[in-house]
């Protein structure tokens, strides 16, 4: 089964946040929200590796949504599979100061990815990366089921996946409880 040459990444609305297609500009916003602080305890990668992975995932997602083949986009790797990247956006003012909580990052508080999308096996891996001040607030619990619903939904509404899996280091008990 072949994946489409071009993907239209749908916006997804959650109760607390909404998701929009990630852009190249959002890569810099991940630095502003300190998304890579403590990465080794969360994903098992150090800051440099996590930053590199997010950069590659966003670029692959943008390339796919533009209809570029991996060898045309400059981000290709013959062994890499397709990726979809969403930016997680909030419009919350939790402290009641009249300013949006994430105004310094254009309201981006993290990203969620479907990576290693395999059309033949109909499987993908899901990964969430949140800014350090946005962890443990229930955002992952809000958005993960919605992204998985899109992944499992039959085409054309979704990707028609049969399996979506997650890789979490054993010591990250907080994330393990969300993913279960």
Model-based region annotation:
Residues 179-180:
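Conserved active-site tyrosine of GNAT-family acetyltransferases
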Residues 29, 125, 129, 142, ...:
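Amphipathic alpha-helical recognition patches that constitute DNA-binding helices
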Residues 1-133:
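GNAT-family acyltransferases
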Residues 134, 138-147:
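Conserved acetyl-CoA pyrophosphate-binding loop and the N-cap/start of the following alpha-helix
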Residues 131-135, 150, 162-176:
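Conserved beta-strand-loop-alpha-helix junction that forms the acyl-donor binding cleft
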Residues 24, 51, 141, 170-173:
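Alpha-helix N-capping/helix-start residues
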């Amino acid at each position: 089964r072949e994946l489409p040459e071009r993907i239209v990444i749908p916006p997804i609305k959650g109760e607390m946040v909404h998701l929009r297609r990630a852009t190249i500009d959002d890569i810099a916003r991940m630095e502003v929200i300190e998304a890579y602080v403590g990465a080794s305890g969360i994903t098992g990668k150090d800051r440099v590796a996590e930053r590199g992975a997010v950069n590659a995932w966003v670029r692959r997602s943008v390339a796919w949504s533009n209809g570029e083949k991996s060898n045309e986009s400059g981000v290709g790797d013959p062994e890499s599979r397709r990726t979809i990247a969403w930016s997680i956006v909030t419009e919350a003012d939790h402290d009641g100061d009249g300013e949006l909580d994430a105004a310094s990052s254009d309201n981006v508080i993290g990203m969620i990815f479907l990576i290693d999308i395999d059309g033949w096996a109909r499987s993908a891996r899901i990964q969430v990366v949140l800014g350090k001040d946005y962890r443990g607030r229930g955002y992952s619990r809000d958005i993960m089921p919605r992204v998985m619903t899109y992944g499992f939904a039959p085409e054309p509404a979704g990707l028609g996946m049969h399996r979506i899996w997650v890789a979490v280091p054993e010591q990250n008990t907080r994330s393990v409880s969300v993913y279960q």
